[in-house]
Amino acid sequence: SGIKNRLFENHQLIQFLLDSASVFKSKKINFPWLENFLSFTPFKSIIDKNKVKNLFISKDSKSYEINMPFIDLLTAPGGKRNRQLIYGSKVKYFGEADGWAFVQNTYDSYVGYVPQNTIVPETKKTHIVSAPLTHVFLEPNIKSRNIEILPLAAKVSRQMVENGFMETELGWISVAQLKRKTELPKDPVEVSKLLQNTPYLWGGNTSLGIDCSGLIQISMLLCGFAC
């Protein structure tokens, strides 16, 4: 009954439900109270309660990853930005409705919505972007056409190296701006200096815009610490 008097942000409530479901499922406890619980929470305005119930008792989530340079993690479909997810970030995928995927970031456990077409099944990544931003080129040549740009801490897969460039699933990236996942920096403070003078952006996680949480998270993440 004490839960009824608590105020939740949408993402906090979703997280609470997911965490509770995990505990109950592990103990094989039924939870017929779910519909009653949803009837007095703001969560019912975000997702149909039957979909939530299916989510709550569904089979285990699937492992996916972000396939865009970066994408906003939203508190509701078309809603406010809560955080940003970077290319190669691992997420737990719970389901889709009306073109929106409901996911949980495996690094910080934030949950929210991203467009369905911005996630793909998880793949093995070998390297991580170690520069504030890096270009992806069509060919292993700086005069080649750049076809994409990736932010700090984006993860890619090595295919081959030529002329100082690494071929990845996206194209060619300068080797100087990549590090093996097994050879990451050790000092988050030094990493944070790469983002000096970055403009402030609420929920931002890149050198195009970042907030205090994002700065700490990216600095720790590049050193191999989930945060």
Predicted regions and their residues:
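Hydrophobic beta-strand signal
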Residues: 92, 154-157
